[in-house]
Amino acid sequence: MSGAWIFVCGPSGSGKDSVIASARKMLGKNQNVVFARRMVTRAVQFGSDHDPLTEPAFMALLQVGELAWHWQAHGYHYAISQRYAADVKAGRLVVVNGSRAHVQALPASPNLRVVKISCDTHRLAARLAQRGRDSSAAVAQRLARNEQLTELHADYEVANNADLATAGQSLANYLSG
């Protein structure tokens, strides 16, 4: 694969962060793959991997063109720094923990690939409840949103229904292939 943005998408609770972290560990020091850090207008919580920023800081970065990608979901702003565009131009893959709704709104591009992390609905519900981040009403909203966004066109799909190592290896194989 030549330089590209790799958007890893899937419903909340599908294990995107865990699958990405597993693949990252398996790839080691592979210089052709860069894992972008998301910026989110939310405090860091256990199990999340992002750089927190305030809403005014987000708006300032947006106004000066420092964001390559940005979207809104679940009441928060998410963003990827413009600095990663240089990696894509240099022929590297830049892995982004993205949003299904955002990716569906993007125009087709030869340097954009979508990887879908899928998971059975009953596992999603259990994982969302277990992490304790959301109220039961918010969990129900996330599950309903998942039903609305099931038709994501993806270039590759990783099933994360059982063994995390298997899912991580599947993503690592795609990124290194």
Give residue ranges: language-model regions.
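Post-Walker A helix-loop "phosphate-sensing" segment adjacent to the P-loop in P-loop NTPases
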Residues: 25-35
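Walker A/P-loop
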Residues: 17
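Small-molecule kinase domains that catalyze NTP-dependent phosphoryl transfer to phosphate-bearing small molecules
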Residues: 130-177
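Conserved phosphate-donor/acceptor-positioning beta-strand/loop module used by diverse small-molecule
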Residues: 95-98, 108-130
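ATP-binding Walker
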Residues: 14
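ATP-dependent small-molecule kinase phosphotransfer cores
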Residues: 38-94, 98-100
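P-loop (Walker A) phosphate-binding loop of NTP-binding proteins
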Residues: 11
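Hydrophobic anchor at the beta1->P-loop junction of P-loop NTPases
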Residues: 8
